[in-house]
């Protein structure tokens, strides 16, 4: 019965960061650090603060997600890492070195260590897949033999060996993004910045690209910083996430923790599309008080991930007594933690509504009596 009721999503979770540090010992120290970072722009309406007092550390080898509403400062933040944006105040440290002190030559070398992929691919339409990937190496003066070896390796990594003579117009969106990823890796970077890299792709292609990014992170030990408005992308691939609002950090933590128990209103709003809303049909029938003796108590149970095991639904239903009906919901695993929500209707129990809620609290981290239905 439990298997039939419980919906579990196999999210192909990214390997635990602890596991990756065994393969890459250098992962146990902070790679990128923002210290009191601020960025302002002069606009027609006056000075606009894009970033305010950002203090944040990203561990080497981590897949780190950045989310927030439009204009929250996400792109401004990651563009300070390769110095495409000059901070107004504060510092950006990479491997404990303040990059604000770099001269032009050191900045060029830094930018080669930082790959970047974009929403709109930015491929050259008149060049083939091979030529698009090769171009940064050509510009850098890399000898032809080395260029060919590197391009061949990268096209194999992203699965485009058979498309090396194709032009961008002949590629799907996912294939174009794979070219973009290959091009971003030509200089063997140790940081990869992803700015809405999957937002122009369909769900199936998004999964494919995320799988590729996971593989790159695992094999190469890259630090990946990922901006997205798609919360499912954060859930799928990231180790930790930070939420920005008006240029400030309003929440951060492990993905399972933020998703399971969002504290800030912005986080709650952004996560709302992933939550199970109360069905309209149920809302129309819900009553504050029971209208008859055979009315069912409607309970909402939330699992926030503080315990790693999935709830034993058979034991839960038996403890509630009476006839228990699952109205909606499911439980999924994120980073090894069980998260989700169940809506239950309980009829014919010897327990009253408050007693049912307390009993359900032995299995769920949050329980609520929503009302009664007949």
Swiss-Prot record:
Protein name: Methionine import ATP-binding protein MetN 2
Recorded catalytic activity of this chain's protein: L-methionine(out) + ATP + H2O = L-methionine(in) + ADP + phosphate + H(+); D-methionine(out) + ATP + H2O = D-methionine(in) + ADP + phosphate + H(+)
Family membership noted in the UniProt record: Belongs to the ABC transporter superfamily. Methionine importer (TC 3.A.1.24) family.
Task performed by this protein: Part of the ABC transporter complex MetNIQ involved in methionine import. Responsible for energy coupling to the transport system.
Localization annotation: Cell inner membrane
UniProt enzyme class: translocase
Keywords assigned by UniProt, alphabetized: Amino-acid transport, ATP-binding, Cell inner membrane, Cell membrane, Membrane, Nucleotide-binding, Translocase, Transport
Predominant location: membrane
Single GO MF annotation: ATP binding
Cysteine disulfide partners in this protein: none
EC code(s) of this entry: 7.4.2.11
Residues annotated as domain ABC transporter: 32-271
Membrane topology, from the record: Peripheral membrane protein
Protein residues bound to ATP: 68-75
GO cellular component, one term: plasma membrane
Native species: Pseudomonas fluorescens (strain Pf0-1)
Subunit-structure text: The complex is composed of two ATP-binding proteins (MetN), two transmembrane proteins (MetI) and a solute-binding protein (MetQ).
Lineage: Bacteria, Pseudomonadati, Pseudomonadota, Gammaproteobacteria, Pseudomonadales
Pfam families: ABC_tran, NIL
């Amino acid at each position: 019965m439990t298997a039939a009721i419980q919906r579990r999503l196999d999210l192909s979770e990214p390997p635990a960061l602890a596991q990756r540090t065994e393969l890459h010992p250098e992962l146990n120290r902070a790679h990128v650090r923002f210290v009191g970072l601020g960025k302002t722009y002069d606009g027609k309406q006056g000075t606009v603060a894009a970033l305010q007092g950002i203090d944040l550390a990203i561990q080497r080898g981590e897949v780190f997600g950045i989310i927030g509403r439009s204009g929250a400062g996400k792109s401004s933040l990651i563009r300070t890492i390769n110095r495409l944006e000059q901070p107004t105040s504060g510092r950006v440290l990479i491997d404990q070195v303040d990059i604000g002190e770099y001269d032009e030559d050191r900045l060029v070398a830094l930018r080669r260590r930082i790959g970047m992929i974009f929403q709109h691919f930015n491929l050259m339409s008149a060049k083939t897949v091979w030529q698009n990937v090769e171009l940064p190496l050509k510009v850098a003066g890399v000898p032809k033999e080395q260029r060919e070896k590197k391009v061949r390796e990268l096209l194999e990594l992203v699965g485009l060996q058979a498309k090396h003579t194709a032009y961008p117009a002949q590629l799907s969106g996912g294939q174009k993004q794979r070219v973009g990823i290959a091009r971003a890796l030509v200089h063997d970077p140790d940081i990869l910045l992803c700015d809405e890299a999957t937002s122009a792709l369909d769900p199936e292609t998004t999964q494919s690209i995320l799988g590729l990014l996971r593989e790159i992170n695992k094999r190469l030990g890259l630090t990946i910083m990922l901006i997205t408005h798609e919360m499912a992308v954060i859930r799928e691939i990231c180790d930790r996430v930070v939420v920005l609002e008006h240029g400030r950090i309003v929440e951060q933590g492990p993905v399972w923790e933020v998703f399971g128990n969002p504290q800030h209103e912005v986080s709650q709003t952004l996560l709302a599309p992933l939550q199970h809303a109360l069905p309209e049909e149920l809302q129309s029938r819900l009553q504050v008080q029971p209208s008859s003796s055979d009315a069912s108590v409607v309970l909402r149970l939330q699992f926030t991930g503080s315990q790693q095991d999935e709830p034993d639904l058979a034991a839960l239903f038996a403890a509630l007594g009476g006839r228990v009906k699952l109205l909606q919901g499911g439980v999924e695993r994120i980073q090894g933690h069980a998260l989700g929500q169940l809506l239950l209707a309980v009829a014919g129990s010897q327990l009253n509504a408050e007693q049912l809620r307390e009993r359900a609290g032995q299995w769920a981290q949050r329980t609520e009596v929503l009302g009664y239905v007949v």
